[in-house]
Design a protein with these regions (language model features):
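Extended, charge-rich low-complexity interaction segments
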Residues: 128, 190-194
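Short, flexible loop segments at boundaries between secondary-structure elements
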Residues: 71-78, 156-190
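A polyanion-binding, active-site-adjacent surface
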Residues: 1-154, 158-162
Length: 194
């Protein structure tokens, strides 16, 4: 019997099985399909959610993070196919991306998770600067707060704004005031221009 080989994943830096890599590539394919040509705002989270249904670009239903984000943006899912909903998100010039493109393994402690984020940050910033090229970055994960000094305007090559959204921490739910602040941040960013 062959011993499974674990290799570092390009998307998150964690040691990964073939299934992990296949799942990352599937999610990358889903996200690429709805990537706008000109990205007005990149919504940056710490890591991808565990469940595919929580992953915004999944063809499944929009639950968890995906549902909360769409609600915060005022994008209705009622009576629409996932393609119609994602096309609306795309038309707004928005992209949701994660510093770690894969979920953090469940047995990873907080210090290990932070080390993963710090280690993968240069690669993620290079991707933002060279490939995505957004007009602005909106950091929405509270877990990225300790990396704020590394996420300055010069690192991604565009203005960086912080409006933490608790839904991107699996153990918290966003409250009404947080949703209102998040909704208010997007038009303000658009008015800033670059």
């Amino acid at each position: 019997m062959a011993v499974p080989t674990l290799l570092p994943c390009d998307g998150c830096g964690q040691l990964a099985s073939a299934e992990h890599i296949a799942r990352r590539l599937q999610r990358l394919e889903w996200a690429t399909r709805f990537r706008p040509i000109h990205i007005q705002a990149l919504l940056l989270t710490a890591s991808a959610p565990e469940a595919d249904s929580d992953f915004l670009y999944s063809p499944e239903s929009f639950t968890g993070q995906a549902g909360d984000l769409l609600t915060a943006l005022g994008i209705s899912t009622a009576g629409k196919s996932s393609e119609e909903v994602l096309a609306d998100f795309q038309k707004r010039g928005l992209v949701l991306a994660s510093l770690l493109e894969c979920p953090i393994e469940p047995d990873t402690n907080a210090n290990e998770a932070r080390a993963l984020l710090e280690h993968h940050l240069p690669q993620a910033l290079a991707r933002i600067r060279r490939s995505l090229k957004p007009k602005r970055v909106l950091v929405v994960s509270p877990e990225l707060q300790p990396l704020a000094s590394h996420l300055s305007e010069s690192a991604p090559g565009c203005p960086v704004f912080y409006t933490f959204f608790a839904t991107f921490r699996s153990e918290f739910a966003s409250d009404a005031s947080e949703l209102a602040a998040f909704r208010a941040a997007l038009p303000a960013l658009a008015a800033q221009g670059t």
